[in-house]
Regions:
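Hydrophobic/aromatic-lined pockets within catalytic cores
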Residues: 47, 51, 78-81, 141
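C-terminal accessory segment of soluble enzyme catalytic cores
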Residues: 81-142
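Catalytic cores of DNA base-excision repair glycosylases
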Residues: 34-36, 57-65, 76
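Basic, amphipathic alpha-helical segments enriched in Lys/Arg and hydrophobic/aromatic residues
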Residues: 65-82
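Short, structured motif recognition centered on aromatic/hydrophobic residues
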Residues: 5-6, 38, 69, 107-110
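Phosphate/anion-contacting hairpin/loop surfaces
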Residues: 1-37, 42-52, 57
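Residue-level signal for secondary-structure boundary elements
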Residues: 26, 37, 78-85
């Protein structure tokens, strides 16, 4: 699929691609045929910022949802790049430096903790979706 920063990756591309798809949105975000370069961690963060439940069927996304996914994909990836990536276990850059993006996780690895969104009283819950860990606010991700 297109790179997240490619002009082809836009709300119209997403909306058209998803029109009749019954797969959940999280599976599409980590599918390299749909868009390149989004892994599990970033998919969780993108969906949180977009207020979308990872189990939501792709064909049910509105154009507004699609626009938010595009915008938040770029936001999350730029933030991660600027912070050197995410060092969960032993990841280091080529120069041997650990990334700092994990310090800003909104949902990933926050099972049982309060949602970081202002005025939300939700609790982050871990779910296994397609054999991958997913983290979802039980209130603000619909």
């Amino acid at each position: 699929g297109p790179e997240p920063f490619d002009k082809k990756f836009n709300q119209n591309y997403i909306h058209f691609f998803f029109k009749k798809k019954t797969k959940n949105i999280k599976d599409f975000l980590i599918d390299q045929h749909f868009v390149s370069g989004i892994g599990n961690i970033y998919a969780n963060e993108i969906l949180f910022l977009s207020k979308i439940n990872p189990l939501k069927k792709a064909k049910l996304l509105s154009k507004k949802n699609c626009k938010e996914i595009v915008s938040n994909t770029k936001k999350v990836l730029l933030d991660a790049i600027n912070k050197g990536g995410s060092s969960i276990k032993d990841f280091k850059s080529i120069s041997g430096v650990k990334g700092d993006f994990q310090k800003d996780f909104k949902v990933y690895q926050r099972d049982g903790l309060k949602c970081k969104r202002l005025k939300c009283i939700g609790i982050i819950k871990k779910k296994i979706i397609s054999n991958r860990s997913s983290f979802v606010c039980n209130i603000c991700q619909k």
